[in-house]
């Protein structure tokens, strides 16, 4: 409900001295982030800041009433999602100053740190935490953000974490999860992992850049608010770990432990899976797009592979709506193998079923790739090769043969059907 507009006095912030101060800053960019550009500071029609309330938020903003209420709805929906993920209901109202035009705000009405971040086109979350006997007994956060879509949600994730856990975790987790919270559209449910819904500039930047290693992201001395580019890498890692079933079961407990200051680390949690995570992380960076689902593109590290023979060929069932799947076959470079296929699949809800040869455009064709370890012990892939309805093929490398239905990686979800593949010498 909208209340009467009021002038926000700076005296409140003079009393907002804290026992412990935690500051987390959102990404600031004047060029790459189209939805987080510098706030227009040119003269504008007067729009005195007003207060708008919902169950979990109090926002002071110069946005028009309709836009302010829409923002409240988006914030409340996001809060349901993140509180469900972390299994911790919000404890207290999150207060936000959301600025559309600085010209509408009287001098001194914004905290200097908040105003500085808003001037730069980003935002900041200031939190105070009160301890007693080493235990957190109270926490309060205030958000300052531009009204550009995305920044208030990002900062609200920081505020929620600070108020409910007393901290936001290390930078890679704090900023990566804040970007995830901003991008989440639906409550995560078992069996229905999240698809990629980030901004287009994130995809374009990552796909065109030299990847940052896991070590660079997790163990660097980067600080919050450093660059929008670093935020992209942190989001990518958190999205992979949170939505890929190979790693998600460990990721949520790790995050909760980081938020509650338990003696844990990324290396302790995933040390035994380092090679696999590094491989899937780089694979994700090369192939993701809007709609990409890590659960459908996860790699199978559990299936046992062995060499086939002419008497008993190895059989596998390859689903159309998944990425590379285990054939169970170990192949040797240069050797020929017999292959047969049975069944049909399709690559869209309304498309016709096709065999392993695919359609006229090549979609739906049975494809192969070989996974092997290089001299450094890291996983690598051969060039993908077409199998279709062939009755023989030559292995391009020695290793584990994986198969899939050819389709765009971010469009697998609407595929259906499966093909049985038998391979022998």
Where are the language model's segments positioned?
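Boundary at the C-terminal end of the N-terminal hydrophobic targeting segment
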Residues: 30-34
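Acidic/histidine-rich, surface-exposed loop or edge segments in extracytoplasmic proteins
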Residues: 49-68, 136-138
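Bacterial N-terminal signal peptides that target proteins for export
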Residues: 1-17
């Amino acid at each position: 409900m909208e209340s009467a507009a009021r002038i926000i006095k700076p005296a409140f912030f003079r009393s907002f001295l804290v026992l412990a101060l935690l500051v987390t800053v959102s990404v600031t960019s004047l060029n790459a982030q189209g939805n987080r550009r510098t706030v227009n500071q040119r003269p504008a029609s007067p729009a005195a800041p007003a207060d708008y309330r919902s169950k979990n938020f109090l926002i002071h903003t110069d946005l028009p009433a309709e836009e302010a209420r829409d923002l409240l709805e988006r914030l409340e929906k996001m809060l349901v999602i993140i509180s469900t993920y972390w299994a911790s209901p919000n404890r207290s109202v999150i207060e936000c100053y959301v600025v559309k035009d600085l010209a509408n705000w009287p001098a001194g009405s914004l905290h200097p740190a908040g105003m500085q971040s808003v001037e730069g086109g980003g935002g900041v979350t200031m939190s105070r935490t009160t301890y007693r006997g080493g235990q957190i007994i109270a926490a309060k956060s205030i958000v300052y953000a531009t009204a550009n879509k995305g920044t208030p949600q990002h900062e609200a994730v920081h505020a929620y974490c600070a108020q409910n856990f007393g901290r936001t975790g290390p930078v890679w987790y704090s900023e990566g999860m804040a970007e995830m919270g901003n991008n989440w559209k639906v409550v995560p449910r078992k069996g229905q992992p999240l698809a990629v819904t980030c901004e287009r500039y994130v995809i374009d930047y990552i796909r065109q850049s030299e990847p940052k290693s896991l070590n660079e992201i997790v163990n660097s001395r980067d600080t919050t608010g450093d660059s929008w580019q670093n935020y992209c890498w942190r989001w990518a890692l958190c999205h992979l770990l949170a939505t890929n079933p190979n790693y998600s079961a460990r990721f949520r407990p790790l995050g909760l432990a980081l938020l509650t200051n338990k003696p844990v680390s990324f290396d302790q949690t995933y040390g035994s899976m380092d090679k696999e995570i590094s491989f899937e992380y780089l694979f994700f960076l090369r192939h993701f797009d809007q709609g990409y689902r890590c659960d459908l593109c996860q790699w199978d590290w559990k299936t046992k592979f062995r060499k086939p023979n002419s008497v008993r060929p190895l059989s596998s069932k390859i689903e159309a709506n998944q990425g590379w799947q285990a054939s169970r076959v170990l192949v040797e470079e240069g050797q020929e193998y017999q292959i047969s296929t049975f069944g049909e699949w399709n690559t869209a809800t309304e498309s016709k079923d096709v065999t392993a040869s695919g359609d006229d455009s090549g979609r739906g064709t049975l494809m192969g790739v070989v996974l092997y370890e290089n001299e450094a012990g890291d996983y690598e892939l051969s060039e993908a090769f077409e199998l279709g309805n062939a009755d023989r093929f030559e292995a391009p490398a020695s290793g584990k043969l994986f198969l899939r239905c050819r389709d765009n990686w971010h469009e697998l979800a609407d595929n259906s059907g499966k093909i049985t593949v038998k391979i022998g010498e």
